[in-house]
Regions:
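A transmembrane-helix-recognition feature enriched in membrane-embedded lipid enzymes
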Residues: 3-74, 124
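Soluble catalytic domains of membrane acyltransferases
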Residues: 67-180
């Protein structure tokens, strides 16, 4: 009986979290529209302020999941992140990876899957924060090189979440960016 209650509690907490994500994402979509329209013309200072704002919302989202018992997270070494020129390469086993990382280190820039620009709750967050859509081109490498002169960059070398089979397929983008 206790297991069923625990499952129900976590299921309800997760359902509320998805509702929060949808509502917060929609509100951010509207609120960040003017900044998203500026796109690449927005200055770094504005992008950093928006990243900290979005990271703060994600921080409280993670806090809710932790307090509700749906998630347990321990962070180590995050104080070392955020220096210009730093390429942060991490694996991507779950949907929440980027949220977990950027809630604790919101100044990081990030290469994101370009398909997320079609997601109605993520598009304006991505554009307003100045995140870099993965176009898998030489222009992307040049853009990353420019970004790394002033910022640190978060990169998922798998390109997407790890499959259910646990097999990791690395894309060569991390190596290409690192070598530049």
């Amino acid at each position: 009986m206790a297991e069923k209650l625990d499952f129900l509690k976590r299921w309800l907490a997760t359902a509320i979290a998805f509702l929060f994500w949808a509502v917060a994402g929609t509100l951010l979509q509207l609120g960040l529209l003017p900044f998203a329209k500026k796109g690449k013309q927005a200055n770094l200072s504005t992008q950093l302020k928006i990243r900290h704002f979005v990271g703060g919302i994600w921080y409280y989202f993670i806090r809710y999941l932790s307090c509700a018992g749906a998630l347990k997270v321990t962070y180590h070494g995050f104080e070392k992140l955020g220096r210009p020129g730093q390429l942060v390469v991490v694996n991507h086993p779950s949907l929440l990876d980027v949220v977990l990382i950027l809630s604790k280190a919101p100044s990081l820039n990030c290469i994101v899957k370009k398909d997320l620009l079609h997601n109605p709750t993520m598009r304006n967050q991505i554009l307003a924060c100045g995140f870099i859509p993965n176009t898998e081109s030489l222009d992307l490498l040049d853009h990353c090189e420019r970004v790394l002169q002033q910022e640190s960059l978060l990169l998922f070398p798998e390109g997407t979440r790890t499959g259910w089979d646990g097999i990791v397929k690395l894309n060569r983008g991390a190596v290409s960016i690192g070598l530049r």
